[in-house]
């Protein structure tokens, strides 16, 4: 019967059955007959139509063998399938469904031996499978995913494959089997990119085998996995018997756990082997060069972590040094290291998307904390994320901060005052429970904000392009600005409000609907994020990954329009803003920023624009080559920042912490920017010194006085002139005030740390001033402004004198460009390249008012917009009125190298000729002085006028401090006729003072030219009598000015440049005869331009000449008399010394009648009246003595 049945079978069935050897029922490790298997493979390969029938027959036989527990037959069937797949891989789609059906039957048997035997078949199936079949047949795809799911479930540590809980060794065998199947899928290049759903099933099972509370265990697994990869990736062998004896010939590098004798130790070793296999599986998934696979695996990893967080598992913890660690952070970083370099950014982007999709509720805040910690750990690591869009990630983080601060129930409203320790809490139990929840919610929200701002800072760890840091900070500051389109010209409008309350209201009105940081907590978070960016981008110790990278400095222009944050109503915002600015000054400025910047010079292209500009110049014509590049807009940040400092000193004078904050900010500005900050800070400080007398209480006066003299103290330290008379005067006054307790404790040098000054806006313990000393002592002001400026200029010249640097080898992007702008001065001469530019010197000596600063910024902004909107500008083609040609066809601006004549100077030249009398040849063109307006009326029109100038009879026009200078017509009330009654020129003093340094500029004047006039300081609010000025004791500290004392005058002093013996500077001029001097001594009258003379002075009649000579004699007598009496102005800051050694002052306030013409000043008479003893140092006679009147 059996023989008849065998003869009736088809040939393929007969060939298959001949492959099965005769074995016992329970036999294992059975192999097919080799000769019959070879014939079967030849038959299947030669007749492909029979392969599908072979697969169907094997499927039926496997079902019978599995039912009868014929393990040997099942093993033979699996080996036949493996041989068929490897022999005919192209025909696999014909019987692939049968293979999956056989594997599914074996998996359902729950027999560990049969399932382990199916792994080689599944590996061959995954290796040779065609992915197109999965895409074409959805039923087949579902069948494949079912098999993968069943294999993956075997690796679970929580679910059991059998009906009963297996023993430890059996459980490890099940898990290893599942992990091997997962590794087969991950290793297949064809199946890895087909269905991402398989990783949703496989990755969680892998992570379960890697889950541990010991991070060191993960390091061991990773080390062993990497070692196995280097040694060839040999698969782990099956667990051997515990009784195995190690022979002497065996290798000595055995795991020490394997040498133990107990089963527990062997179980630990087996557990470690399973973990290594799981680590290899996870690595195999992430190393694939498939971005979709990396994305799917990352999503599965994040889901697993979120499940563990919801189960109250600790996946992230903070170390003692503040760094985040934990299982989640470790696995996230490992996945990023394994991923291909070009696909690593996919992991971070996936994590950011997961963070944005998480519901933002108090219950889910822990999920946000964990995700933010993982993102921050990846950003701050040494893993390079090539291809990452930094700005997109930054905007996502900012958007998430916005969501956090807009959560219902502001965290600030949930704060409650803690009860005293040791006393029972009077609140009820339900109230306490609610309070605990509220406090926990506040703490978690703070933690989320802290981690988000740290993530923003960690974005700066790796620099992927030159302007990355600048773009990041600019984006954050743009979100902080009240309006989206905020410009420099609009920033002064926001500064017109004096009080913080009005500024807050204006800010609320101007805030854009999409403005991000309307809340105080968000402003603080943004400013701290900026500080974090600056700290991370400029580490004290460079990372190895950033040594070869270069980037651009963060320019000062990004801070334009942000100074209003210093005037915010909340003290923490003011402190955070000052901290961010000081961090920028500390980390982003270089030694080049300490040098004086000359805005009047030609702008220089950025380094990275040089190559492009050079290539462009080769391709353009000569006409277009004359076109200049667009100027970099000038920053007004320092001007407006000092204005905000001035406002804060007045508005927040009640808070000592605000004074300390301003002291720290001013000290950092002086330390890092030098004269570039002093040019704006010194006039403001002198203006603030004048406002001390307006303070209502003694403590207010002490605070303002400490801030003012603290600034002077900084100058003496930074510019190293403590040993001069000026420096000793400043330090002696500081010592005197400290001895009288008229000083704020924190105003010191070196400055205290910002974290130690407390929170601005908080009232601290008020120091008690001694009442007896308040009535008797006074704060002596410092008024030697000209001498102080000369000390600063001289020290600057000495400190900047250094050997010239060699040019850079290539114009590549470097890290040495200054912050204050890309404009550099033209090639200077040897004598003046290290001197302070004259317009900066004049600015330090100029008046300072709040309105003048705002007007100057507005005027400069309008000028920049007008000049930038047309092709012919002053800085480019010189097509405007200032840059036009003179009448003789000569362009005076083209050849003038002195910055005095520039139209962008803050103040006009104060010499009669304004430095426009250039040194020229006697046979060349006649010197044509080019004033600010370039008007022909301001030129020397006759020889008689030249005689008047050289003899000193033609006085310079009054110096003005506005944006419009020398624009009055002939009928102006401030003309030369009423020169004696001009309130801006009441004091005229020589500048020979003890401790003062003569002003040696690079402008060489003739010895007979009149001295240059400079303002010293703004006049005091409150008149000071002559007796007080001469050495009176003055009023007490708590004195307050009366309305009668509020008359204001302006005091000027002449800084004589001295005689210059340089014959090359000015051509020699023959001496003028006495008769000609008498003829030219008339009082000029007319326009302050100095270019026209009235008809009375130019008349050839003898009567007019006699009147001029009489006027000349009266002028000489009046000048000598004026030099012998004290000034009648309110208070001359140069007359503080007392005695015969104080500087002299002259005044024309009490001249003749109204019909009397103003006299001309005789230079010889003026020089004869100078005291020869001026300049001698007698202790503190002229500086800091008690003879000064108080505020």
UniProtKB/Swiss-Prot annotation:
Gene name of the encoded protein: EFR3
Polar residues composition bias: residue spans: 899-912, 928-940
Region described as Disordered: spans on this chain: 484-503, 800-824, 861-940, 953-1160
Cross-referenced PANTHER family: PROTEIN EFR3
Organism of derivation: Chaetomium globosum (strain ATCC 6205 / CBS 148.51 / DSM 1962 / NBRC 6347 / NRRL 1970) (Soil fungus)
Any one Gene Ontology BP term: protein localization to plasma membrane
Protein name per its UniProtKB record: Protein EFR3
Biased composition (Acidic residues): 1054-1065
Biased composition (Low complexity): 800-811, 867-891, 1085-1108, 1116-1126
GO cellular component: plasma membrane
Family the entry assigns: Belongs to the EFR3 family.
